[in-house]
Amino acid sequence: MRRLFLLFLFVLTLFGAQAQPKWGTWSVVPHVGVSFANLTNDAIHTTDERISHSQTRIGFSGGADVCYQLTDKLALSGGVAYTQAGCNFKDIPADLNAKHGTVFHNAYFNLGYVDVPLLAHIYISKDLALSIGCQPSFLTKATSHTEMQDYETDGKGGIKYDKNEVSEGDVKHWYKKTAFAIPVGISYEYENVMLTARYNFGLSNVYGHDLGDSKNRIITVSVGYKFNL
């Protein structure tokens, strides 16, 4: 995820300059995009002591920001956005050296948050800005999905699978209602079109009731349009 974010930063720095925003002005920027989310230190542990670690889950992100150009080099913004988060888990295949076991596949946590990013934007050129701030997020949904199959091996490379079982449901009670993050990002503006990338560095444990210690790690890439007021 960090490599993707750094590549995006590099591409944006290659673009040319546009008109500098005027200080003392307001604007509204609705935006839509995609999220690349993961949960730190999260994993599924099987009965045969194998581990499926979390990996990136791709989802939707969209919302709107209200911006105030404080000076030629500094702008402030507040916004509301909906972001899909959570994580996928790596499939656990059959172990042909074992007499029996369970395979896990298509496992994921699907989380939804309403984010309230509060940001300062520092212009490093006429059209390119770096941003940093704070962000509370409010959990709106949390579901889990796992598919599993028991199996037996014959010791000769053959394997017999039982029926595929699907386990899914609402797990919102596992998670805290509020999460906090530090968003850092970069934005490029061309003819009022805004291209933005943000990395949300989660500060708080998303789980409640001592279920684990995982934090959100989310990259959002979005395109928006700047309406000057």
What are these regions (language model features)?
Residues 20-67:
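Short glycine/proline- and aromatic-enriched beta-strand/turn motifs that initiate or cap beta-hairpins
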Residues 30-34, 60-68, 80-82, 116-124, ...:
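Residues on the lipid-exposed face of transmembrane beta-strands in outer-membrane beta-barrel proteins
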Residues 26, 60, 74, 114, ...:
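Hydrophobic core residues within well-ordered beta-strands of beta-rich domains
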Residues 60, 72, 97, 102, ...:
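N-terminal non-globular leader segments, chiefly Sec-dependent signal peptides
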Residues 38-57, 84-112, 139-179, 183, ...:
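Extracellular/periplasm-exposed beta-strand and loop segments of Gram-negative cell-envelope proteins
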Residues 21-23, 69-71, 125, 191-193, ...:
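Outer-membrane beta-barrel channels and translocator barrels
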Residues 1-31, 223-229:
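Bacterial Sec-dependent N-terminal signal peptides
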